[in-house]
Design a protein with these regions (language model features):
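Short, low-hydrophobicity acidic/polar segments
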Residues: 1-56, 87-127
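Edge beta-strands of extracellular beta-sandwich domains
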Residues: 129-131
Length: 131
């Protein structure tokens, strides 16, 4: 789950899985697909700074911190699994008006620690402040 900057790149990580059996008596099959990956969506909306001043969104540098990004997908069972001893790394995306200030990523299902999912984001405001 390395490069997910664009919708086209993210589509490569959205694994779908379906399984069924055809028989001679029932040769037509219906496939019900399920997503094997976990999707994370973060949408940033304008608000106010700590002093109560309105903030207009500009380019936002956003990270999911400490994510395991290596694993396997079993095509027999449809199970996506993180490699438990995989190194952790950060997943970065630049958010702007073109992507509606929305971070979207497909991740291998994994257990996040008790502290929860850590998100870091920074933006330079129109008047030059870094928040």
């Amino acid at each position: 789950s390395e490069n997910q900057d664009t919708p086209e790149e993210r589509a490569a990580f959205d694994f779908l899985y379906a399984s069924t059996k055809a028989t001679k008596a029932e040769p037509n099959v219906h496939l019900n697909f399920n997503h094997a990956m976990s999707r994370v969506n973060l949408k940033f909306v304008p608000g106010t700074d700590p002093e109560g001043n309105p903030v207009t969104l500009t380019d936002i540098e956003c990270y999911l911190v400490g994510i395991k990004r290596n694993g396997t997908f079993d095509t027999e069972t449809g199970v996506a699994a993180v490699t438990e001893d995989a190194a952790v790394s950060d997943l970065r995306q630049m958010l702007n008006a073109d992507n509606d200030y929305t971070f979207t990523a497909y991740l291998l299902p994994q257990t996040i620690g008790a502290e929860g999912l850590q998100i870091e984001a920074a933006m330079t405001t129109a008047d030059g402040r870094r928040i």
